[in-house]
Amino acid sequence: MNVYTVSQLNEQIKNLLESHFVEVYVEGEVSRPTYHTSGHLYFSLKDEKSVIRCVMFRSALAKVPFRVEDGQKLIVAGKIGVYKPRGEYQLYATELHPSGVGSLQLAFEQLKAKLEKKGYFASELKKPLPDFIQTIALVTSQTGAALQDMLRIIQNRWPLVKVYVVDTLVQGSDAAPMIARSIAYADGLGVDVIVVGRGGGSLEDLWPFNEEIVADAIFEAKTPIVSAVGHEIDFLISDFVADLRAPTPSAAMEMILPDRQEMLMHLDLLMQRLTKRMQTILQLKTQELGHLQNSLFQLSPQKRLEFYEKEITIMNERMNETITAILKNSSHEIPHLKALFDQKIEWIWKQKKQDLTSLQQKLTMTMEAKKIPKNSAQMVKNGKPVSLEDIDVGDEVELQDVHYKALAKILSKDAL
């Protein structure tokens, strides 16, 4: 009978298991994953009947793009190892693959959910782009075809824009940190908009734009950012965080820059509208001026004098008609009525004549007043303008200008 010590048996088991299960693939459900401060990951993998403990060291874990969570279905690649002091075995994981979905896709969904929860995709936080962009920063590879495509569109559509090219890696393990630094640099240039872009490629090629460090740089930037990565069918984390998503780098330029031909046509249309509007305003103001001139003429002394003369003529005709009618109907009262009408006519005639004389004097005085130089006055005697030659010592006269009149007495008169 061969009797083993505990250590000997554990050693035999260790050698047997570790030599036989050098590379295994185990599928199961993750249970109680723990990220240790040392950087290692500890978890269990289970199915309906059994559980096996697993460990993944920091060096291998760094290559896993997603975060291991409780309940995930994984395919774990690794080897079996035995911890001899306790006689326990576990699976030392070297690779982790999600069941039914790729690792990168899972990492994408995890980061998308995380950033959405943090508010990175909120529409109310999106920064509006200026209506007319004067300066633009292109964060892309200086040697890539995407840059040449964007510069060509800029030249064709709106060559007046000033362009800053911020060179950066756009794929590879070192690309994401460099893209983040380039975005921060472009944000400090004071441009109107930043376009982060590259041409199409595989999911692995485009992956730097799915990294959290790039998402943070886009979200924290003060300048509006356009994400223009890959082709129209590619949707990346940078697209969701950016203020505007463009399907391609070329499309980004067409979306944010005006077309100079369309702008010239628009300016021509505006000029036509402005010219038509100015012509309309000129016509209206000309009509208003004509109305004002007519109103001013209607209020002039000459017009009022003509009005009174016309009124007197009309009244005279009406009175003659009235007299004729009365004479026909009351011939027996002719002598008496004739005397009354004669008196009335004489009185009315005198009144109207006085009004006419007064108006003529006012008109004359007004016309004369217009000839009076500034700070001078017109001399009036007995209601008529006179000169110094027409007055004598002791006469009382009025001194008048366009605003005031004053009574004066002539104390002396000497020839010059």
Swiss-Prot record:
Example of a GO MF term: exodeoxyribonuclease VII activity
Enzyme class label: hydrolase
Pfam families cross-referenced by the UniProt entry: Exonuc_VII_L, tRNA_anti_2
Paired cysteines (S-S): none
EC number: 3.1.11.6
Presence of the UniProt keyword Kinase in the record: no
The keyword Nuclease appears for this protein: yes
Main localisation: cytoplasm
Cited InterPro entries: Exonuc_VII_L, Exonuc_VII_lsu_C, OB-fold_nuc-bd_dom
GO BP annotation list: DNA catabolic process
GO cellular component: cytoplasm; exodeoxyribonuclease VII complex
Keywords: Cytoplasm, Exonuclease, Hydrolase, Nuclease
Classification via Gene3D superfamilies: 2.40.50.1010
Catalyzed reactions: Exonucleolytic cleavage in either 5'- to 3'- or 3'- to 5'-direction to yield nucleoside 5'-phosphates
Subcellular location: Cytoplasm
Record note on quaternary structure: Heterooligomer composed of large and small subunits.
Family designation: Belongs to the XseA family.
Entry function: Bidirectionally degrades single-stranded DNA into large acid-insoluble oligonucleotides, which are then degraded further into small acid-soluble oligonucleotides.
Protein name per Swiss-Prot or TrEMBL: Exodeoxyribonuclease 7 large subunit
